Amino acid sequence: MQRLTLYHKVCSNMEEKEIIINGHEAVDLGLSVKWATCNIGATKPEECGDYFAWGETSPKNVYTEETYLYYDAANNRKLIDIGTEISGTEYDAARKQWGDDWRMPAEEELYELLRDCLWQWFTINGVNGYKVIGPNGNSYFLPAAGTSDPEYPEYNECGYYWTGSFSDEDCHWDALCLKFNDDEFGHYSTYSHPYEGLTIRPVTDKSN
């Protein structure tokens, strides 16, 4: 994986209010979108939930190039083109699992979360992760859910969260995700192979 950028910023405080959309709780962090308080497939903030390959809308048992729905083995191992921004489309797992009001975060929404929020390494019921505090003082918890890779699960050590954005520049052919841990790098944007199983924290429009 390739590390890109690290951001930090101090934020303020205000009372949080419960927001329920299609049966799922959202929190207004004072950003351009509201964020879900749980991962897809989770019922509590500290639960990992389900893992998804990028552009696939259902979890599965094995995550490899060969099992990836958009892997084109007959065409020099290239990927079937589903676009470079799938947030809100038919390839969006958040929209498929939670309904049209929810979607995967786009690139600019991830950068906003990194740039404008205070990130504090935190533990809930034995699960490590980050408490993310927005500019308005509201917060949510992102568990270190690791990946679906049985050899390097990294559960309780690292978190990997998909966005809906993809890069095909310079033969990169990888999708943008958030990665975090508690070491010197903290939290940053990076790219991951689209066939890997990562978690998703959905967003919803501010108007919802």
Predicted regions: what they are:
Residues 11-208:
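Conserved positions within compact, well-structured domain cores
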Residues 1-13:
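Short, Lys/Arg-enriched N-terminal segments with co-localized hydrophobic residues
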